[in-house]
């Protein structure tokens, strides 16, 4: 069922995302006792190495009809980067090579579109800072669905071209992402489309958990001591935490409680600023950063991201544009991984968290790299 994150009321698994009683966000609830019977380590050993090996924990009734090959990206032991960061052990979860559009958004889109098809939708739309637009355009093309993507008009040229090439209708809006998203929320019910991050958001967001599932399995079911996650809406961070907790509930992973940390760009850091101020709410901001994929000034999951970081003993930090570029360069030179600006935010913020002692130097950390540097060449030219 869909369940309100505030009052707990349940709703059918339909194209809806807000509780009618208190306007709280809806998320998918599962029958873990039932899942425990089929999702075992033995069963997993016989399944294809994609995110869909964990299908019981993803909200699609049947087999995935979109993005069946998405996920199971490398988890790389990054010894040289660990030395640059000043920590004993570092791992890089590299979604810069995710299929088909080189970002973690292929995970969430695969789930959202597979569920949209089950609900009978033929047209899909989204509001995007770039990577989501690319993924929706590519995956709808392969599935034979129509698509509309709404983006801020000043996005990186590469990301705009990467959406146009698939034949999607790309609509540039003068304004920042939050203004684009508000427009999409207004028209979501008007045309009968599946908006992946509006009326399909509860299903879309669940796809992010697959990153946590893979990290745990790739570490031989030992959950990492620390995970650093870039934050735009904050959803990736909250869902990685949910994924870890689900594996503990099912007895698949050790019951250690991993600490989850957030990373933002200084030019758009409402969640990080609230955390540093000791508040459980954030103030919306107007984004001004080269990390355009993280440029969400009114983060939908900001409140819940703050809650997760506090509950797990985590922290948050932010980095300037120059620090983002330096961190991108460090990851490339140390490990041969060219990340987009969001990855520079993750690596740069991790370095600050380690230097400040928030992540102890004798511990181990996983860094979530969410997109490919070929998409943000403008930032390093």
Predicted regions located by residue number:
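PLP-dependent amino-acid enzyme catalytic core
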Residues: 1-381
């Amino acid at each position: 069922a869909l369940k309100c994150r505030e009052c707990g009321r349940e709703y059918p698994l339909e194209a809806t995302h807000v509780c009618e009683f208190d306007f709280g966000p809806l998320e998918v609830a599962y029958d873990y006792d039932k899942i425990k019977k089929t999702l075992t380590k033995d069963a997993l050993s016989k399944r294809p190495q994609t995110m869909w090996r964990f299908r019981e924990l993803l909200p699609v009734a049947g087999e995935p009809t979109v993005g069946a090959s998405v996920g199971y990206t490398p988890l790389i032991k990054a010894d040289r980067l660990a030395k640059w960061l000043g920590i004993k052990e570092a791992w890089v979860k590299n979604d810069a090579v995710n299929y088909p559009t080189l970002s973690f958004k292929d995970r969430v889109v695969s789930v959202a579109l597979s569920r949209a098809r089950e609900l009978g939708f033929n047209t899909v739309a989204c509001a995007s800072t770039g990577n989501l637009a690319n993924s929706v355009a590519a995956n709808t093309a392969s599935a034979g669905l129509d698509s509309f993507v709404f983006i801020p008009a000043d996005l990186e040229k590469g990301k705009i071209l990467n959406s146009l090439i698939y034949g999607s209708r790309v609509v540039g809006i003068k304004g920042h992402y939050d203004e684009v998203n508000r427009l999409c929320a207004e028209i979501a019910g008007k045309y009968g489309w599946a908006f992946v991050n509006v009326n399909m958001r509860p299903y879309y967001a669940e796809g992010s958990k697959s990153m946590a599932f893979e990290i745990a399995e790739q570490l031989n079911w030992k959950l990492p001591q620390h995970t650093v996650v870039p934050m735009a809406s904050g959803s990736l961070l909250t869902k990685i935490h949910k994924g870890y907790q689900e594996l503990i509930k099912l007895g698949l992973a050790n019951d250690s409680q991993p600490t989850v940390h957030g990373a933002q760009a200084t030019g758009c850091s409402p969640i990080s600023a609230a955390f540093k101020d000791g508040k459980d709410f954030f103030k919306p901001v107007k984004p001004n950063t080269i990390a355009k994929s993280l440029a969400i000034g009114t983060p939908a999951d900001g409140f819940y991201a703050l809650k997760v970081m506090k509950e797990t003993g985590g922290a948050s930090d932010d980095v300037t544009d120059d620090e983002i570029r330096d961190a991108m360069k460090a990851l490339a030179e140390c490990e041969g991984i060219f990340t987009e600006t969001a990855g520079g935010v993750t690596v740069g913020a991790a370095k600050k968290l380690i230097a400040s002692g928030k992540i102890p130097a004798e511990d181990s950390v996983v860094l979530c790299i969410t997109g490919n540097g070929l998409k943000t060449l403008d930032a390093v030219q």
